[in-house]
Regions:
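Sec/Tat signal peptide C-region and signal peptidase I cleavage site
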Residues: 3-9
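Hydrophobic face of amphipathic alpha-helices that form TPR/SEL1-like repeat modules
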Residues: 11-18, 33-34, 45-52, 83-85
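Short helix-capping/linker turns of helical repeat alpha-solenoids
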Residues: 18-23, 36-39, 52-54, 59, ...
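The canonical alpha-helical register within tetratricopeptide repeats
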Residues: 33, 62, 69, 84, ...
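Terminal, low-structured helical/coil segments at or just beyond the last alpha-helical repeat
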Residues: 78-112
């Protein structure tokens, strides 16, 4: 188990360097396989890109969707940020984000 976590950490770092340099497209490319493997940290980072509109169009619904998924995968940061984000969303948008999260999980995080 620790070996897998180490590999995930190294792969996650491959996305963090370009992200911190403002190269969001490369960061997203590096994180996508991890997101699809259920890596909570990568899912959380993807949520932040939607929240901030970094490399993607800013979208609170998709940010909330990925925060839901990351929280379910074990990210405490995602749980905290989700509680903050809902204050900026309508009940309809929250419901849509929850529906999208359920569908994404059913598809094993592919094409979400």
């Amino acid at each position: 188990m620790a070996c897998g976590a180490t590999v995930w950490s190294v792969d996650l770092d491959k996305g963090l360097a370009p992200y911190n340099a403002g190269d969001f497209a490369t960061a997203l490319t590096e994180w996508k396989p991890l997101v699809e493997q259920g890596n909570a940290a990568a899912q959380y980072n993807l949520a932040l890109t939607y929240d901030e509109g970094e490399g993607v169009i800013q979208d609170n619904v998709y940010a909330h969707m990925w925060l839901n998924i990351a929280a379910a995968s074990g990210s405490e940061q995602a749980r905290s940020n989700k509680d903050i984000l809902v204050k900026q969303m309508t009940p309809q948008d929250i419901s849509k984000a929850q529906d999208l999260a359920r569908e994404c999980v059913k598809k094993n995080y592919k094409d979400c």
